[in-house]
């Protein structure tokens, strides 16, 4: 069988000889379009891409026989009155044979990739389309050229215009970040189902998204069955069930540990609901600030919030209404610009791997110190979170303050957000009769229509250095001031001096340095307390194991029996010769708290309930 060859290959070879020098002086983006529907979907994107400076945009169509020719695409562009400086090439495929189409597209795409070596090739994702299979095969064969293939489902194309606002440097990393979703749940199956429905309605642009549902030990049967039967078409589904109740703090922190620096996680509690455009905000922000030129400035950015907060919970007296527009008054920043805030969001956010890995080292070290030696008093100045007892955010806020880290927040009109919290009863939410429902306080409207770009100043995400920075209270401050505040606190709580370098190690060891002499003193005190506890344990058991003679008519002062216990406790050694309590068939009601050997006490802890009438202890002379 004779292979068909596209006339494009012969004519294009002559064109390349005259344009080769100009092609290599500029970055190149290519789009391959198979048919009119794809052309309609991708036209706004390639026209916007063509406006990039020093970027050549090439569009390849498969021909009139496949639904769209070069002339047809030109007419369509003219009808749209688009300013669109693109080079259009027509493969003019005439065959209807599926394998023939695949081979012709493979040949043409391979030739194009080898000759132009574009930075990016954008096309529609469709595994049933043999022309698209030809593109996939050509990209695979030319993998050594380093061309980034970006394939998106046709239904997502109309929501992809933000891609054209990214620099080519960022687009080349389209497939680099891997985003996983971690859901925390226990016994709210209806809430969980609502969250999953919102996830399924989102635009993921062809990315593979793994979903992990983390159930605590107390998960009810309905929740377990829902998780078992749940279908997740966007990637791998994982179900985890704890055998020991861990609580919300452990459930959140232990749900995710990054496998590399491109492994991102979306943390969601089950009473959160998402906008269909939450992943647009996620991927746009990650590519913009992590993989483009902005990355040299954004190393202290630890995540992206989906929730546009209208409450600041960190004021020392208590929660206060919060509107970033008010804090931006009198500055040069637009009222509705996204902003960088130190406060971590637990109501829908994506967290970055380096800082979360650092937090995984910092958090257990702090817990261990607080439950043992208590050598570090890390108190964030004028912040309510210092009083929190069961929140993982308390410790993350400490780390954030010490490092000067920030999170990106949306700031759309009327607090429109990519997530909302329904604030249903749970670990930190309690419904109180006669008071406003928590959802009325914390709930925000979801972005239901695609206004991701139109709601931003200038219609795009600002450069990192153009974003305002807010401290924990919400005041607009220079980023350098946040860093200096953290260094100042570190100087107070750690023996290791803070680094003056802007290069981050994401290792908390320098924060956790303590005086070794003080550590040894504290350890000796702990051992002494353990020894005292053992002595008291022995003394109390010695007394409690003797029955008391109640035949005598003399009454015993309850304090005297307690003094016997304390005499034994305070002695340097425990000896039966100190007291001699005879046995009796009658036992009085004596209740004394006996400490376990591993319990620590700072002073004798004896609880007594005594009914000692007609009891005579016999003490040796």
Residue ranges of predicted features:
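Peripheral/terminal regions associated with large enzymatic or DNA-binding modules
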Residues: 2-267, 272-598, 602-621
């Amino acid at each position: 069988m004779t292979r068909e060859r596209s006339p494009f290959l012969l004519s294009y070879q002559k064109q390349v000889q005259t344009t080769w020098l100009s092609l290599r002086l500029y970055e190149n983006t290519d789009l391959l379009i198979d048919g009119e529907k794809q052309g309609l979907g991708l036209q706004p994107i390639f026209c916007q891409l063509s406006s990039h400076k020093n970027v050549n945009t090439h569009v390849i169509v498969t021909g009139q026989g496949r639904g769209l020719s070069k002339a047809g695409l030109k007419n369509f562009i003219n009808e749209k009155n688009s300013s669109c400086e693109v080079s259009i090439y027509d493969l003019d495929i005439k065959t209807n044979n599926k394998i023939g189409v695949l081979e012709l597209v493979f040949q043409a795409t391979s030739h194009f990739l080898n000759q132009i070596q574009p930075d990016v090739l954008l096309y529609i994702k469709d595994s049933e389309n043999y022309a698209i299979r030809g593109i996939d095969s050509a990209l695979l064969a030319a993998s050594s050229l380093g061309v980034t293939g970006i394939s998106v489902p046709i239904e997502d194309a109309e929501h992809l215009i933000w891609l054209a606002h990214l620099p080519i440097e960022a687009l080349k990393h389209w497939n680099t970040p891997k985003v996983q979703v971690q859901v925390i749940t226990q016994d709210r199956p209806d809430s969980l189902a609502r969250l999953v429905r919102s996830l399924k309605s989102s635009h993921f642009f062809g990315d593979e998204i793994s979903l992990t549902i983390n159930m605590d030990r107390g998960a009810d049967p309905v929740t377990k069955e829902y998780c078992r039967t749940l279908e997740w078409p966007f990637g791998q589904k994982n179900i985890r069930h704890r055998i020991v109740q861990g609580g919300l703090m452990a459930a959140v922190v232990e749900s995710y540990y990054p496998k590399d620096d491109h492994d991102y996680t979306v943390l969601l509690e089950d009473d959160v609901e998402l906008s269909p455009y939450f992943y647009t905000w996620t991927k746009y922000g990650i590519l913009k600030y992590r993989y483009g030129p902005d990355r040299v400035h954004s190393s202290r950015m630890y995540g992206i919030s989906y929730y546009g907060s209208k409450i600041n919970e960190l004021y020392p007296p208590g929660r206060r209404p919060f509107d970033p527009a008010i804090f931006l008054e009198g500055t040069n920043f637009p009222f509705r610009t996204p902003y960088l805030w130190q406060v971590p969001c637990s109501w829908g956010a994506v967290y970055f791997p380096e800082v979360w890995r650092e937090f995984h080292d910092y958090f257990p070290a702090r817990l261990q110190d607080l439950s043992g030696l208590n050598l570090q008093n890390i108190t964030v100045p004028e912040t309510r979170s210092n009083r929190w007892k069961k929140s993982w955010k308390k410790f993350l806020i400490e780390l954030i303050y010490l490092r000067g880290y920030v999170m990106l927040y949306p700031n759309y009109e009327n607090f429109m957000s990519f997530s909302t919290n329904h604030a249903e009863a749970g670990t930190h939410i309690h419904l109180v009769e006669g008071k406003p429902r928590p959802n009325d306080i914390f709930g925000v409207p979801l972005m239901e229509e695609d206004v991701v770009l139109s709601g931003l100043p200038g219609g795009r995400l600002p450069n990192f250095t153009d974003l305002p920075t807010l401290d924990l209270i919400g005041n607009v401050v220079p980023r350098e001031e946040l860093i200096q505040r953290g260094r100042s606190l570190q100087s107070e709580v750690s023996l290791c001096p803070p680094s003056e370098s802007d290069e981050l190690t994401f290792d908390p060891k320098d924060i956790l340095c303590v005086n070794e002499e003080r550590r040894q003193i504290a350890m000796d005190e702990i051992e002494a307390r353990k020894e005292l506890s053992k002595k008291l344990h022995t003394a109390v058991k010695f007394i409690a194991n003797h029955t008391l003679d109640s035949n005598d008519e003399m009454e015993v002062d309850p304090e005297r029996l307690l003094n016997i216990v304390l005499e034994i406790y305070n002695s340097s050694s425990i000896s039966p010769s100190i007291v001699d309590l005879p046995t009796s068939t009658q036992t009085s009601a004596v209740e004394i708290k006996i400490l376990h050997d591993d319990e620590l006490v700072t002073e004798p802890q004896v609880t007594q309930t005594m009914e000692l009438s007609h009891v005579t202890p016999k003490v040796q002379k």
